[in-house]
Structure formats: structure tokens, C-alpha cells
Design a protein with these regions (language model features):
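N-terminal single-pass transmembrane signal-anchor helix
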Residues: 7-35
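N-terminal secretory signal peptides that target proteins for export/translocation
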Residues: 1-6
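Conserved short hydrophobic patches within well-ordered secondary structure
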Residues: 21, 27, 46-47, 53, ...
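Membrane-proximal N-terminal amphipathic helix
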Residues: 39-67
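Short, low-complexity, Pro/Ser/Thr/Gly-rich segments in the mature regions of secreted, periplasmic
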Residues: 162-185
């Protein structure tokens, strides 16, 4: 008696399912990695844009377009004023900047009347709630940019006129503050 043996060619259902599961896991990892890469690229662009705004204000102070602050005071330049010279109107996230919370601060930390020692600070916020609080120029980096899905609470001081007091740096126990002597908004 002859036994009919099936000619086994191809894959079993279990083997096919295993391959599909492995491919799904690999795709999930790839998509997650790509999203993180895109988000980091947007944050880097956010910081680069902030640096361009700072450079524009630094040039404006040098050229006399913006007022050099007196000792211990600061000049605040709103982003909407800087946008005119840089051409940047939207954040990397595709939304306009919040005018009241996006500005450059020029602080004169000089000790004597005959010297000028300027420090530059920046605060940015867009209408999608991607932001960073008032930060010294040297501290601008990707890790300070937060987004709307962040659990970190943002406390950006709104500036709209002269006379406001800004806290520039509170690290080290003592706070550095300045009074806004000029507002370019």
C-alpha cells in the first residue's frame, strides 16, 4: 500500500504569523525613532531661530537701532519687531509666536558708568505652546525647549511696557533682576 505524502512546499500559518509580528515590531521601532528624530530637529531649529533673533538684536544695539540700557536695567525687544529684519514669522512647528511671551532682553550688568557689559536673554513661545522660559544666551540648547505635551509648567513673564521687573537668573540662590527701561514692541 502506498502512502500519500503531501508535498510540503511553502510556510505554515504559524511561520507567517511570526514573520508578521516581527515586522510589526520593527516598524514600530522605526516610526518611534523617526518621530523622536523629527521632534529633535524641530527643537534644534527653534534654538537656531532664537539665536538668529539674538544676533539681530545684538546688531541692532551696535547700530543704534535699539537702545543700550543703563546700568542695571534692560531693553526688551519683542519678536514681532525682530521678525521684520529676519523674515521669520512662524516657529518650526508652523505656528506664529506669542508676541507677549517672545522677546529678547538686553541687560547691562556693568558696574561703572564708563563701561558697558551687555548680556542677552531670550524667551520664546508659539501658539502651539512650544516654549522656553527666559534663558541666558549661553544656555540655549535643545533640552530647554518644551512642548504642549510636556508636564513641565512654563512660567514666561509677559512684557508689554517699560517699568516691568524681570528675573533674569535665579540660580545660585540670589536672583538677578532688571527693570525694563525700554520696550521695543
Amino acid at each position: 500500500m502506498k502512502k500519500n505524502k503531501m508535498n510540503q512546499k511553502g510556510f505554515t500559518l504559524i511561520e507567517l504569523l511570526a514573520v508578521i509580528v516581527i515586522l510589526a515590531i520593527l516598524m514600530t521601532l522605526a516610526v518611534t525613532s523617526m518621530q523622536r528624530y523629527i521632534n529633535n530637529a524641530k527643537k534644534d531649529t527653534y534654538i537656531t531661530t532664537a539665536q538668529q533673533f539674538l544676533d539681530s538684536v545684538r546688531l541692532g544695539v551696535t547700530n543704534g537701532d535699539y537702545e543700550t540700557p543703563d546700568i542695571g536695567s534692560c531693553t526688551v525687544v519683542a519678536i514681532k519687531n525682530i521678525e521684520k529684519t529676519t523674515g521669520t514669522k512662524q516657529s518650526p512647528y508652523g505656528k506664529p509666536y506669542n508676541d507677549a511671551k517672545s522677546y529678547v532682553v538686553v541687560y547691562n550688568k556693568a558696574q561703572a558708568a564708563q563701561e558697558t557689559s551687555l548680556e542677552y536673554y531670550m524667551s520664546m513661545d508659539d501658539s502651539l505652546d512650544n516654549w522656553f522660559v527666559l534663558t541666558k544666551e549661553s544656555g540655549l540648547k535643545r533640552s530647554i525647549v518644551f512642548s504642549r505635551d510636556s508636564t513641565t509648567a512654563g512660567n514666561i513673564t509677559e512684557v508689554s511696557a517699560t517699568g516691568a521687573t524681570l528675573t533674569l537668573d535665579s540660580s545660585g540662590g540670589t536672583a538677578t533682576t532688571c527693570t525694563v527701561s525700554s520696550f521695543e514692541g
